[in-house]
C-alpha cells in the first residue's frame, strides 16, 4: 500500500493529531525537509503495480493544516530514493533512481533552479547540509540485486555552484541506506548494507581537511541498515533499523570526542524502513 496520511506529534502533551489528506500526495521512498514553518515532501513512489516514481511534491503547513502542491515547471525527473537537504532558504534535491540532476526549490517563489550536477549517479545515499555545503555520500548506481554500494562522495559548494570529491583514503566501505549526521565540523557516517550484508562500522569526515577518521566498532550497535540517526549537539544517537531478518528496537549514543558508545534507553518500538 502507498499512503497519503500522516499525523503531528506533540512531545509536550504526548499526543498525536491527524493531518489533512486534502491535496496530500500518496507516496513512499520520498524525501521530506522542514523549512521552519512548513514541511516539503517531494518525489518517491506513488504506485506499487508497477513501481512508479513521481516528481510531484507538496508543502504542508501545520498551523493551517493544509497542503499546497508545488510547481512542476523545471522540477527534477520523477525519482525515488533521492536525497533532500534544507539550506535555510531552499530545498536541494540530488540524485535518485533515473535522475542524474541536482535542483534547488524555493518555496517562497515556488520555482526550481538547475544546479551543477556531481556527474555521479547515486541513490539510497545519505546527504547533509553543513551551513554552506551539501555533502552526499555512498548509495548505489545500480538497481541490480543484491544491491552493491559505493563509497564515493561529493561536496557541493552552494556559493560557487561547484563540486569536489571526498577522498577515498580511509573512507568507509561501500554501502547503501547508512545514516549521516553533521556535528558542526564533521559528517559522521554509520551502518548500512552492501550486497545484502549489514555492517556496524562508521567514520567521521572533515570537509575542511578532506579526511576520514574511522569510528570505533567497540560497543557499537549491532550491524544494521535503514536506521535513524540524529545529532544532539554533543552526541550521535543511532536507533532502530534492521538486518535481512530482524527489525531492532535498540540503539546507542556515540561521542566523537571520546570515540565511544554508550547504551540508549530501550523502548518497545521498532523503527525500520526497509528499502
Predicted features along the sequence, with ranges:
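Kelch-like beta-propeller repeat domains
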Residues: 1-275
